[in-house]
Amino acid sequence: MIQLTATPVSALVDEPVHIRATGLIPFQMVSFQASLEDENGDMFYSQAHYRANEFGEVDLNHASSLGGDYMGVHPMGLFWSLKPEKLLTRLLKRDVMNRPFQVQVKLYDLELIVNNKVASAPKASLTLERWYVAPGVTRIKVREGRLRGALFLPPGEGLFPGVIDLFGGLGGLLEFRASLLASRGFASLALAYHNYEDLPRKPEVTDLEYFEEAANFLLRHPKVFGSGVGVVSVCQGVQIGLSMAIYLKQVTATVLINGTNFPFGIPQVYHGQIHQPLPHSAQLISTNALGLLELYRTFETTQVGASQYLFPIEEAQGQFLFIVGEGDKTINSKAHAEQAIGQLKRHGKNNWTLLSYPGAGHLIEPPYSPLCCASTTHDLRLHWGGEVIPHAAAQEHAWKEIQRFLRKHLIPDVTSQL
């Protein structure tokens, strides 16, 4: 009898799953197909083809895919190779507390599949739950003064390292990374800063005092270590994360994922001090063969006069973790990170770590998330970049390094525990 098993059936999205098929004919060719319906009703699909061993088994931890959406030994390939049925759709989790993503995995006889359409019922199937929050994590809506967001607290009395989580130009409130960080032991504040509730849809300036209030709010919490907070930032959020690290003594560890070393778009203001954005070169915006916009050439930080717009990163006292995808088509993130590191070196600083991933794109998400290489954002068809397999490897490695970095620099005396 053919059986399809998965362990665990219900897990956090950053946890691997062991999938195995048994009871097959020795050396039978089979196809594993996965599907997921997101919160908007959009479908995502993946497939991979395998040959059973002499015992009639296919163990995805050891077997090599011979075709489909990936080839080789990739135990979690069915997850990170999911592709949207509707082009330019990004998989986003909004409701992290109440509903997991459900991934259906079905097993077919490969000979019965013609033109990628299933010709008969699956030989076996199962449904997996992929959660963005662990049991016991609490979510507290934040509406204190100007602050808008959601605070996620791990189970237990604490104390916990505190982290502020910042996304980019999409706006609104994205909680999935903060909820996962809380599931891994961090008190995590998912902080909105535009296009959410009563916050401006398109702010004219970035007010750094707002983020200072967020840092103080987190440090005041009785379950949070009071020695300093961390920041995890991506894209547009990176320019804010950098400024926080420079100007706020409360920030002691900053993760910068695919961002710039200068403000862009709008000025930054802090206690009356104005930092103007680097002008962009609109003529350098390009469109690729698929009609997707590529923005990574639009900021020229080596041009005459550009240095006045760069952040004085050498003034920061905390630690930096730069994470860059070398295949990023939205921001020239590797060049910007290397330029920032060059500033630090020239000032005798060694408070930085660089993780640079060949083949990874702009949207480096938690492990096993599907690559989104392009999507429609604010009516723009943007090319984010990335290649499926190296991007997946980057996500898995970076997530571990982010947690290690934050624990090392946010938990007092953690070095004595290593």
From Swiss-Prot:
Gene3D superfamilies: Acyl-CoA thioester hydrolase/BAAT N-terminal domain (2.60.40.2240), alpha/beta hydrolase (3.40.50.1820)
Catalytic residue list: C235 (charge relay system), D328 (charge relay system), H362 (charge relay system)
Single GO MF descriptor: N-acyltransferase activity
Residues found modified as Phosphoserine: S125, S416
Enzyme Commission code(s) on record: 2.3.1.65, 3.1.2.27, 3.1.2.2
Disulfide bonds: none
Signal sequence annotation: none
Keyword vocabulary terms for this entry: Acyltransferase, Cytoplasm, Disease variant, Fatty acid metabolism, Hydrolase, Lipid metabolism, Peroxisome, Phosphoprotein, Serine esterase, Transferase
InterPro entries documented for this protein: AB_hydrolase_fold, Acyl-CoA_thioEstase_long-chain, BAAT_C, Thio_Ohase/aa_AcTrfase, Thio_Ohase/BAAT_N
GO CC, one annotated term: cytosol
Top-level taxonomic group: Eukaryota
Record localization: Cytoplasm, Cytosol; Peroxisome
Keyword Protein transport recorded: no
Stated consequence of mutating P84T: In FHCA3; uncertain significance
Reactions performed catalytically: choloyl-CoA + glycine = glycocholate + CoA + H(+); hexadecanoyl-CoA + H2O = hexadecanoate + CoA + H(+); choloyl-CoA + H2O = cholate + CoA + H(+); chenodeoxycholoyl-CoA + H2O = chenodeoxycholate + CoA + H(+)
Effect of C235A: Abolishes N-acyltransferase activity
The protein's assembly and partners: Monomer.
Function statement: Catalyzes the amidation of bile acids (BAs) with the amino acids taurine and glycine. More than 95% of the BAs are N-acyl amidates with glycine and taurine. Amidation of BAs in the liver with glycine or taurine prior to their excretion into bile is an important biochemical event in bile acid metabolism. This conjugation (or amidation) plays several important biological roles in that it promotes the secretion of BAs and cholesterol into bile and increases the detergent properties of BAs in the intestine, which facilitates lipid and vitamin absorption.
Illness association: Hypercholanemia, familial 3: An autosomal recessive metabolic disorder characterized by reduced biliary secretion of conjugated bile acids, fat malabsorption, and fat-soluble vitamin deficiency. Clinical manifestations include rickets with variable growth failure due to vitamin D deficiency, and coagulopathy due to deficiency of vitamin K-dependent clotting factors. Additional variable features include pruritis, anemia, hepatomegaly, and bile duct proliferation on liver biopsy. Laboratory studies show abnormally increased levels of unconjugated bile acids.
Name the UniProt record assigns to this protein: Bile acid-CoA:amino acid N-acyltransferase
Organism of derivation: Homo sapiens
